[in-house]
Structure formats: C-alpha cells, structure tokens
Amino acid sequence: MQERSFFSRHIGLRSDETQKMLDVLGLDCIDTLVSQAIPHSIHLGRVLNLPKAVSEGQALEELSKIMGRNHVHKSFIGQGYHGTCVPPVILRNLFENPAWYTAYTPYQAEISQGRLELLFYFQTLISELTGLPVAAASLLDEATALAEANAVAVRFAREKKTKISLQSLLHPQILSVVQTRAETQGISISENSEICSNTAAIVLSWPDTKGFFNDYSEVIKEAKAKGALVIVVADPLALTLMEPPAQWGADIVVGSMQRYGVPMGFGGPHAGYLAVSDALIRLIPGRIVGQSVDTKGRVGFRLALQTREQHIRRDKATSNICTAQALLANMATAYAVWHGPQGLQEIAQRIHSLTCRFMGGLEAAGIPCEGESFFDCVSVVVKGKAQEIARQAKAGGRLVRILDDDRVAVNFDELSTEEDACTLAQLFGAQLVDQVSPRLWGKGRDAAFLSQPFFHVVHSETDMMRFLRRLSDKDLALDRAMIPLGSCTMKLNAAAELMPVSWPTVANIHPFVPKEDAAGYQEMINQLNAWLCEITGFAQVSFQPNSGAQGEYAGLLAIRRYYQSRGENQRTLCLVPASAHGTNPASAHMAGMEVVVVKCLSDGDVDIDDLKMKAQLHKDRLAALMITYPSTHGVYEENIKDICSLIHENGGQVYFDGANLNALVGLTRPADIGADVCHMNLHKTFAIPHGGGGPGVGPIGVAEHLKPFLPGHAQNGTTHAVSAAPYGSASILVITWMYIRMMGAKGLKYATQTAILNANYIAERLSQAYSILYRGKHGRVAHECIVDTRVLKEQYGVSVDDIAKRLIDYGFHAPTMSFPVPGTLMIEPTESEPKAEIDRFCDALLSIAEEAKKVGAGVWPKDDNPLVNAPHTLVDTLDDAWVHPYSRQEAAFPNHHLDPTNKYWPPVSRIDNVAGDRVLICSCPPLGNTS
C-alpha cells in the first residue's frame, strides 16, 4: 500500500472541506483567493527548486544516513558543554511530550499554570545555587546571558560608567559574544585591567576557561570600594558544592544549565541563567515568573514586570529578548527535582573526585599541571605534544581540548567513568591514584540548599511521571486545541520531525569537535542552507541566531558592518513603522541605531508620504528600514516593492522581518521583493515547536553584498558572534530539515495557500458579529486577521481581556491581544487545523458576542456575568454557594460544541496582575523561612 504524502497529514483540511470554505468566500478555487490577496507584482511565477517530497519513513532514513556521518566520541572538551545523562523519565514525559513542547509563551497565565510553576521552580533553583534573590526564567545561552549582565551593570550606573573589566579568562566563545554586544552599546571591554571610576562591573569566571578557581577576594573588595558591580560566570553543578557567589560579593551571576540533563546537541539549545540582587530587579532582561493570587485567593503564577519588555517599551526595553529557552529550563528543573539536592551533590562530588584522582596521578608521575583549585577540569602541560596527545585520545574514542601547542585540558562530566580517567592518564604516562583531598576553592556550602518541598517530593519514577503529568494537565497546548495566536504561527510540530532530535548522532555531539567528526551536521546544515536560500531568494544563511529577536540583531549588525566597510560609519538610523513588532525597535537600539518611527495609514499600510519624507530627510544617515510583510495588520501591502526601492534610492538597506513568512513560502520571496536581509523564525514557519517560550531559531538570509558580514565565531578565528555556538541551536535544525524534505515545493506552497484560506474563512465568519479591521485591495486578508472587539467594550462594557478569558471556558487559547491595535484580537489559524476546529473557534467568538449583548440588555449585570467572571474553574463551578445570575452550565459549557468528556478546566480563575507586581515573589523561600 502506498504511503500517504506527509503534507496531506500536515494540512488540516480535507479536499471537500477546502471547497466548503471556498464556497463561503464565493470562490471556485484557492488560486483565485491567492491572486486576490497577494499583489500580482510579487508573485513568484514558478515552482520552488527543492527536492521532491518524500514520506516520513524515507525522510527519517535519509537523515539517519546523513547524521550517521557524525562520529560520537566521548567528550572531555568542556569549554561550557558537557556530557550529561537525560533521565529517560524526563526525556519521555517532558522533552518528547507535546503537552510541553507545543505550548506557547505563557502570556495567558490561567492556561499556563503548569509550565509557569516549573519555571518558578527554575528561578528558585537558580536563586538557591547563586544565593541571589531574583532569577530570570531563562536566557538564550551562557554567552548572551553575560552580555545582558554587562548591559544591566551599565544601566545601573545610569550609563555614567561604561567599562567592563574582565578579571579572569572567559571561554573564547563567550568573550566573542560579549565583545560583539559591547561594540554597539558603547561599552568598553578590557581584560585584566585596573578597576577605575568608569568601571561599571568586573567579571569573574568561576571556574575560568582553563578550569581554575582563583582567590578573588581582593579584587572584589576593590570593586566594591569603587562602586563597581561584581558579575560571576558560574558552573551550576560546581555551585552545589561551593559557597554561593552572593555570599562573597556577587551582584549578578550567569551561566548555562546545559549540564542539568540537556544534551550538548552540537551547541544547543540550552537554557542560560541570570540572577541578580534586589537592587537590579527592574533592570533584569527577559521574562520573570511571579507569584500572585486569583479572584478566590488561590496561589497562581504569571509573567511579572512585563513593562520592562520589548513588546511594551520597544526601543527603551531592557533587552530585545523575546523567545528564551523555556523548554530547556523546564528540563533542567525537572533534572534537579529528579535528583534532589543530595543527588546533585553526589554527581558533582563524583566528577570532582575523578578529576582530583586524575590530576593526582599526573602529579605523582611528575607531569606538570596548572592551577591549585578546580572542579572538573585539569590543564596539563605537555611541551609541544598537545596535538599528539589529542590524536591519541581520539584514537581511543575520547576528545580532549587543545589549549595551545603546549597544553591540553581534560574536562570530566557526569558520563565520565573510572575507565575513562585511567585510559586518559595513561596517555600522559601516569596512573589514576586511589584517593586525594578535594581541590575546590573556599569553604564550600555551609548550609542545606534546595530545601523547598518540591525538590523532595520525587522518590521514584512513578512520582516523577505523575509530577510532570500533574503540571502539564494544567496547561493548554496544541495537543488539546487550536492556538490562534496572530504573528505566532502555531502550526503542527509533527512527531516525525522531532524524532531525530533525540538520536545520539544529533544529541551527543560537542559543538567544538574536530570538523571531520561533525560531517553529518555539516551536510545537513549545508542542505538546509541551500533550501532556505531557494525559498527566500537570498545568497547565504547564517544559523547562529537562536531566536527571531537575535536574528534581527544579527541582520542589523550585518548592515552596520557593511556600511563601516564602505567608510559610511554615519549610517546608523533605522526607520521602523509604528505597527512593527516590539523587537524591531529594541533590536535596532541594541545594534547601536537610532530609531525613527514611520506612520501608518488608517487602512494599516505604511504611510508612503511619511516614509518618503523621512527617508529623504535622513538619506545621509539612513541605514535600514525594518518592515514586516505581510504587515502586522494582516494584509499584503500593494506597494511593498516601491517601499523597498525608495529605501535603496536613499542609500539604505531593507530589513525584512520574517515573522509572517508563513504567508509567503512558495508564492513569493523576500529577496525578490527587494529585501537585503531577513530573519526566518524556524519555530514558526518551519515547524520547530515553541516549547512554551523557547527554544527558537532565527537564522538570517542575506543578499550577496552582505555575506561577508554574517556572524563569525571564535572557534573559526572570526569575529562578531551573536551566540555561543557556531550554528546556534543546531540540534533542532533537523526539525526544519525534516519539514522541508517531507513537504517539498508543492506541499510548502499548498500550506501557505491553506493558511491564507483559513484566515479569510475566519474573517468571513466573524464579520457577522465583529468588524475585520484591515483588508487588502480586494477585500482579502493574509494568513491572519485583526478582529475589532472594541465595540463590545463601548456598547456593553466587555473588554478584550474578558473575551480572552471567556475563550478559556470554550476551550481555547486567546488570540494575540491588543497588538498592533489596542482592544483587538489578531487571529492566525495556520494551515494545520481541521475545519471542525476552526468552526468551533468561530462559534465560540460568535457566542461570546451574543453573551456580550445579554450584558448590554441587562440580562446579566455588568459586574457579574460569565464574561467578567471568566474563566471558571471546576472547583468554582461545583461550589455549593452558586450565587451568580447565570447557570453553572452557562459558566462551564457555554455552547453545544463543548464535549463534556474533553473539557479543559483552568486550574485558577483570573489572576490578579496588579497584586503580583505590587508584591513581587519570584522564588519559593527555603523551608522555615517565611520572610
């Protein structure tokens, strides 16, 4: 029997359903719809030149052969990446569980309590390890975490101090990212320089890149005396045994949680962490989970202090970070819960003991080693034999790090065995000794840590399985229902696409292995580069950015460096439409550009007259226009080519925000439209799951003239890296490879057409009760539409928040709220949803409009109705004292489409956001501490 094509399973509509939707739109075929929606001037006019689509089985077999060309040696390289054991119970029940990986960022708190709770535990874990009171809910990686910390220090000094003094040796990849960030932010990075009045912070590595702990007591004392902050880059596993950095003066601590049960994956994705003192709370980048209460006083969690973030403060935000690494942070937290504090310390002690015995053996054999104090790494002096030692180690299936011609570093980890240590010692002509004293610096931890009950509840796999299930049951992800978030593209993340991520040949490769050992990765990445170049029309793609916002930053950096190479250093002005995503102005600011806002017209289009005036006014300084297409208003602007030409005529470059690329693939190409650079959200258009707030991948495609200015990497001797690993979150690139390989050109084009059809069908159905705010020339929308709900507020007092919360009772995640227009809903159905689910969603919104009318008619009071009281929990619905003027049935089962056997019950009622920010609680206090 012939296997069905993958794209017929990826796309939610059956052929008869497609025709029914077209009938509602009064159209005979989908091509007619596309021709009405998209300007004729940008139509591609040909089929993409991609390999013919193959089945799931064929794609898996092909990719397996490619990745089989990687050589999985045991890594002793270290340098920020370590072998770790992913507990199977976490691999199966979290990492490979769609209830966890298909969820969106938890902006809608009431339907996100499970992952918010686990992220709250993540923050608690980081606070306990570092001794600092507040931690972010993950950053993109260790290198960007330090770059963000440096920016925090400069902001804390109100930009009167701009020097960061590195007082110890950082890993080369971290140093490179820090230098890149500093270059455009007016920050001076100096190594081992004296602390002066202009020093905002000193940076200490704990341990440093050679594995050493140093006595920093004097330099910390000097920094404190001169008003400089102390930033520490710390290994979180070493911190289980050592005195928390806050106790010896740290104001900020950053690092990577990779070795807490997250595979190396050729560089990512991994969760960076950042913790700060109380004085720095409102300067912290990224998301923070805070504790609050719901309407009944029950504890609930929410994203706190959101006014710091880019979607609100735009170019004045603390950072451009949007997508972080929530899934990996949750994995690391689950790892800590699984092992508990004692288990973590046992792992750390075993690693340290093995390292000490290895070094003791070398010292006994007269082989010089550097450093007095260390945790897991030994730097061995070999006098010109480093290459030969590394070659011999590799011949035995082990990889060590070459520091220079005269020194190698051997880094032990959770997977290292006594046999490994013995064999490596023999390479140096030494034997492992039986027992030696610990070589950690300082007095160690003087008190219990992780005493909170949730780090002690798991004693068996049954406990862990149920712990993760209990949390995931609180959430609404794609495994339960459609998530119609505009500008987020919550499409299917197919099982076959995700399977390879767990393969040893994908997961267990260190990012700095010899090139020949990653031949499979290179081939896969080269193929993906070629495919994405064909899809977008660009000359080259960099996969280093590991989020869309970081892609924006990398693209703008390429533009800036291009102009610098031409001696046009003055070109630092960026035009940004008023309707742009918040990351656009935030990224421009981070890239050292001045942001000038361009007006939009009442129909949602860019105001060409205003654009022309500002482009000509600033033509000598113009660097770029950042533009989203289709626009954030959900329409294809007719004059997009003219807009691009106008910018080029005035000496600028066109930065194309690829957030809405799902409306373009196979139909047109950004480069053909006139773009010079574009980021692609692989976690939107190209099927990588959102993970509840990351991981994401935001590669950038560039035109030929910008190729020399793509991000480099210290490992290759090049500069301007934007993330720690050469290919960013490399291991999840296989998801996009699988997606494109199985869809083929025909499937990709049909997916885009179906996404446009679904959005137009929704717009048509909802226009019975709501105004569709923006439409194109022929009355069509793109792949998303903006529904104006302000009339319900004006006539009946029902807010967009009330509608969003009421949708939970109907079993839905709310669409994007109040962007780009306050009081509206932006709806994006994607191509993956079946017609029945789309109809169920439309019915829900139409029913809510009828409920609002009842409020307006006085059937229900404005202060006591199903909308203002939404969402309704099971406990509240069963309450003996039901005092509302509407029935329990109307509260919990508001229309006949709700299946009582498949009902989603929110665990909390509406969360009090004001209370959560007024009394900020970002971690759980230790047992016995109620302060």
Curated annotation (Swiss-Prot):
<keyword id="KW-0663">Pyridoxal phosphate</keyword>
<dbReference type="InterPro" id="IPR020581">
    <property type="entry name" value="GDC_P"/>
</dbReference>
<comment type="subunit">
    <text>The glycine cleavage system is composed of four proteins: P, T, L and H.</text>
</comment>
<dbReference type="GO" id="GO:0004375">
    <property type="term" value="F:glycine dehydrogenase (decarboxylating) activity"/>
</dbReference>
<dbReference type="GO" id="GO:0019464">
    <property type="term" value="P:glycine decarboxylation via glycine cleavage system"/>
</dbReference>
<dbReference type="GO" id="GO:0030170">
    <property type="term" value="F:pyridoxal phosphate binding"/>
</dbReference>
<dbReference type="InterPro" id="IPR003437">
    <property type="entry name" value="GcvP"/>
</dbReference>
<dbReference type="Pfam" id="PF21478">
    <property type="entry name" value="GcvP2_C"/>
</dbReference>
<dbReference type="InterPro" id="IPR015424">
    <property type="entry name" value="PyrdxlP-dep_Trfase"/>
</dbReference>
<comment type="similarity">
    <text>Belongs to the GcvP family.</text>
</comment>
<dbReference type="GO" id="GO:0016594">
    <property type="term" value="F:glycine binding"/>
</dbReference>
<keyword id="KW-0560">Oxidoreductase</keyword>
<comment type="function">
    <text>The glycine cleavage system catalyzes the degradation of glycine. The P protein binds the alpha-amino group of glycine through its pyridoxal phosphate cofactor; CO(2) is released and the remaining methylamine moiety is then transferred to the lipoamide cofactor of the H protein.</text>
</comment>
<feature type="modified residue" description="N6-(pyridoxal phosphate)lysine">
    <location>
        <position position="684"/>
    </location>
</feature>
<dbReference type="GO" id="GO:0005829">
    <property type="term" value="C:cytosol"/>
</dbReference>
<protein>
    <recommendedName>
        <fullName>Glycine dehydrogenase (decarboxylating)</fullName>
        <ecNumber>1.4.4.2</ecNumber>
    </recommendedName>
</protein>
<dbReference type="Pfam" id="PF02347">
    <property type="entry name" value="GDC-P"/>
</dbReference>
<dbReference type="GO" id="GO:0005960">
    <property type="term" value="C:glycine cleavage complex"/>
</dbReference>
<dbReference type="InterPro" id="IPR015421">
    <property type="entry name" value="PyrdxlP-dep_Trfase_major"/>
</dbReference>
<dbReference type="InterPro" id="IPR015422">
    <property type="entry name" value="PyrdxlP-dep_Trfase_small"/>
</dbReference>
<dbReference type="InterPro" id="IPR049315">
    <property type="entry name" value="GDC-P_N"/>
</dbReference>
<dbReference type="InterPro" id="IPR049316">
    <property type="entry name" value="GDC-P_C"/>
</dbReference>
